[in-house]
A protein has these predicted regions:
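Interhelical loop/hinge segments that connect adjacent transmembrane helices in multipass membrane
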Residues: 1-10, 187-193, 205-248, 287, ...
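N-terminal membrane topogenesis motif
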Residues: 1-28, 82-90, 126-128, 220-241, ...
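Membrane-proximal transmembrane or re-entrant/amphipathic helices at the cytosolic face
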Residues: 2, 426-437, 453-508
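Transmembrane helical elements of multi-pass membrane transporters/channels
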Residues: 12-29, 193-205, 209, 224-294, ...
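Interfacial/gating helices of multi-pass transporter permease domains
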Residues: 35-56, 87, 187-192, 226-234, ...
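Membrane-interface helix-loop junctions in multi-pass transport and translocation proteins
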Residues: 36-38, 42-43, 159, 170-203, ...
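Helix-loop junctions and terminal segments of transmembrane helices
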Residues: 62-78, 154, 213-214, 270, ...
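Membrane-interface junctions at transmembrane-helix termini in multi-pass inner-membrane proteins
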Residues: 140-165, 177, 188, 353-384, ...
Length: 508
């Protein structure tokens, strides 16, 4: 398939994923509001931190998801269907083995940590244990769905992925409304309902794959070489996943130990928003990820690197467009969204947006690193650096700093990790620091300077209110689009985008 056809498919898949993201993010934000009202700050904080313990211990699944997508797309790039079928079965076998290991860890170390180290009110400890058990079951269902999701993504069937995800969030919304009508302990019921959603979603992904992809029919196959290759790739990615999990949930537990569940609730709400933003960028990266791997498998380095540069740049620009109104008017939006805004929520939200913008430049670099498969040195250096986030945050909190210091530390480490990824990639693929600086970083900095500086100056001139919000949000998006058009894209990229939108959305 030609690069032009691949680009069209990437655009189509990206649009499908963005439709999914807009619906999922909108519904999720509304769900957060309802759940916060129904559970209250303390119970919401308990759910957030208890589920976080499970995510922190069970970082294996994220690693295996990346490995599955990489190996499936690689075999499709090689056009080797028999090897793909064998790879799928071996991957499922590994998941079954990991599920046993994770279950043992959670029911021993995790349960001990919950009952002996977490800061949870004594009268809610029983409910917290129920939440823990249902969260384990939810996690296992989510993990078992990953091989099927990965196969759908490798085949670039993003519309199916989007439809099932939209169904999932719609079901969650219905069950949250049902939660308001039930009289039993709502924290326990909420955890149980989320398990039901995870279970049904798993069966939907499995059903579609078995109907459409013959490779998805599991049979026990032992291939020691393939098993070793997947585990070797996953092993070093696992180290990176551990660093990412500690970067997020490790800090969440630190905040619980120092400040209690109310601060966890504020951070949990901010991270619900952050997850939506991350999903926005990840959707774009998800659409290009199979192509990057297939280009690498086919030895087409020129198209691979060009795609990495473009996706890094456009990931940032798309996220900047979405987040500019929230950076300018976060206090007004949160007051409008929530009847009562928890302490620290505004500053958490603003700093998380900045962190997400920095991270957005790194996602395509990580995709390129995963495509070539040699992850040992990469993960030791980048993962080891990110692991320092939690102990450094602990030192600042121990010294008496406010909770938001953890966000400042996170932003610094995210920028440092991006620099290290770039430096390491130059030794793995034909990518240059000068090329990335010229094609990506320089254009991003010019766009940020020419769009956000005048916007923040404008906002500071007027009192907060509905009129300022409407003007700043509308003006912010328009100024950012103009800045991207003039300074962020090349002439050929601008012409291609203009031609595409004129074709899809004719005005005459």
């Amino acid at each position: 398939m030609s690069p032009s056809e691949n680009n069209k498919r990437i655009v189509k898949n990206t649009l499908m994923l963005y439709i999914r993201m807009i619906l999922v993010m909108g519904v999720n934000l509304y769900i957060v509001r309802i759940v916060l009202q129904v559970l209250g700050e303390v119970d919401y904080g308990i759910y957030n931190v208890v589920a976080g313990v499970i995510v922190m211990i069970s970082f294996f699944s994220g690693t295996m998801s990346s490995a599955s997508q990489r190996f499936f797309a690689f075999e499709l790039g090689k056009q080797n269907k028999e090897k793909l079928k064998k790879t799928f079965s071996v991957t499922v076998s590994i998941y079954l083995l990991l599920s046993v290991i994770i279950l043992v860890l959670l029911e021993t170390v995790g349960l001990w940590f919950l009952n002996n180290k977490m800061t949870i009110p004594a009268d809610r400890m029983s409910a917290a244990n129920w939440v823990f058990q249902f969260s384990i079951l939810s996690f296992l269902m989510t993990m078992f769905a990953i091989p099927y999701k990965s196969l759908i993504i490798a085949y670039e069937k993003m519309s199916i992925y989007a439809y099932i995800s939209i169904f999932e969030v719609g079901l969650r919304l219905m069950l949250v409304f049902a939660l308001t009508l039930l009289q039993y302990d709502k924290l326990i019921v909420y955890a149980f309902l989320m398990f039901c959603v995870a279970g049904l979603t798993f069966f939907l992904f499995r059903f579609f794959c078995q109907r459409h992809f013959s490779e998805s029919k599991f049979s026990f196959i032992w291939d020691g070489s393939l098993f070793k290759s997947i585990l070797s790739y996953s092993g070093w990615n696992m180290f990176g996943s551990l660093a990412a999990v500690m970067n997020n949930h490790g800090v969440n537990i630190l905040l619980n130990l120092f400040f209690g569940p109310v601060v966890n609730a504020a951070r949990g709400i901010a991270f619900q928003f952050s997850n939506g933003l991350n999903q926005f960028v990840q959707n774009f990266v998800l659409a290009i990820k199979p192509q990057v791997t297939k280009y690498y498998a086919a030895g087409d380095n020129e198209n691979m690197i060009s795609l990495v540069y473009r996706s890094s740049k456009f990931s940032f620009f798309l996220l900047l467009l979405l987040t500019t109104p929230f950076l300018l008017e976060s206090s007004f939006i949160m007051t409008l969204w929530l009847s009562e805004v928890p302490d620290y929520l505004i500053v958490f939200l603003q700093l998380i947006i900045v962190n997400t913008l920095v991270d957005s430049l790194s996602y395509s670099l990580l995709t390129a690193a995963q495509a070539q498969g040699k992850m040992r040195r990469y993960q030791i250096i980048v993962g080891g650096t990110l692991l320092m986030n939690t102990p450094i945050s602990y030192l600042f909190l121990k010294a008496g700093y406010e909770p938001q210091v953890t966000m400042h530390v996170g932003i610094i480490f995210s920028f440092l990790a991006m620099c290290l990824r770039l430096l390491l990639l130059t030794r793995l693929i034909p990518l240059t620091i000068i090329g990335f600086f010229r094609h990506v970083f320089l254009r991003v900095m010019i766009v940020v300077t020419t769009s956000t500086v005048p916007l923040f100056y404008f906002v500071s001139m007027f009192p907060e209110g509905t009129m300022r919000f409407v003007i700043s949000a509308t003006g912010g998006i328009l100024i950012t689009i103009l800045s991207i058009s003039f300074f962020g894209v090349t002439k050929s990229e601008r012409s291609s985008l203009w031609l595409y939108f004129r074709t899809k959305f004719p005005v005459w």
